[in-house]
Amino acid sequence: MAYWLCITNEDNWRVIKEKNIWGVPERHKNTIAKVKKGDKLLIYIKQENVNGEVKPSRIVAVYETASEVYRDSSRIFKSPKGMGNETFPLRIKLKPVKIFDRPIEFKPLIPKLKFITNKRKWSGHLMGKAMREIPEEDYRLILEYAT
């Protein structure tokens, strides 16, 4: 089993929660191809301005993958600014494990997370990625903050 941090925004988090589907752009096909049924996915919402309020980067849920990767270009996800008509066609069906009552703010976790080796420029570990594998130790640490 592998553990993944899946990077999204507020709009597409609503889609994930409603439809139990994770999707990535074609350019991330090599990454999503490594995901197997039964893997655990943490949903990370990047910092953004929502209705004039700056919401910090946070982890909102954990899911288990319930399918292999499949292709579907139907428009269910919202294309973020600068991504044109992106449909996130490489998808995986999900099964919710836990949707956190209170999101876990990400910045306080940074000093403790093993996968973030550059603590000062930590966003570089996530920038330009749709998802990234994380060590089981980091996954367990994040879950501790959810309780």
Curated annotation (Swiss-Prot):
InterPro entries: EVE_domain, PUA-like_sf, UPF0310
Disulfide partners: none
Gene3D superfamilies in UniProt: ph1033 like domains
Domain of life: Archaea
Pfam families in UniProt: EVE (PF01878)
Family to which this protein belongs: Belongs to the UPF0310 family.
Protein name: UPF0310 protein AF_2356
Taxonomic source organism: Archaeoglobus fulgidus (strain ATCC 49558 / DSM 4304 / JCM 9628 / NBRC 100126 / VC-16)
